[in-house]
Amino acid sequence: MASFTSFCVLFTFCLLLLAHQARSGERQYKTESRNGKCVGEDDQLHAPTEVWYNDNDCSEHTCVNDDTGYYEIIRRCTLIAYPDECHMINGTGPRYPQCCCKVTCELD
């Protein structure tokens, strides 16, 4: 019975972990604008609603604007806490979010 309970606890944890991995770390920063475009973190001009990527730090960027100004939304991989039975593996792709690390757990 104890091993079944342990399995259920670990299985539930893994489901919660997968749900957590689907969310990104998202931040919004007010940015400078020129000619109706955002000045991105990469010092390039980006039109509102334009999406671009920084493959060096596995992030996705979007330029948005409203009545208060221009903003750059940056999505990056989240930090993942995991139990000893699990380990982190590299992402499977070159671009966000596929480049984010994932956690895998061994079930006994």
Swiss-Prot record:
Keywords: Disulfide bond, Secreted, Signal, Toxin. It comes from the Eukaryota. Residues 1-24 form the signal peptide. Its main location: secreted. It is found in: Secreted. Contains 4 disulfide bonds. Coiled coil: none annotated. One of its GO terms (cellular component) is extracellular region. Expressed by the venom gland. It holds the Pfam family SVWC. One of its GO terms (molecular function) is toxin activity. The keyword Signal applies. The keyword Protein transport does not apply. Belongs to the scoloptoxin-16 family. This is U-scoloptoxin(16)-Er10a. It comes from Ethmostigmus rubripes. The lineage of its organism: Eukaryota, Metazoa, Ecdysozoa, Arthropoda, Myriapoda.
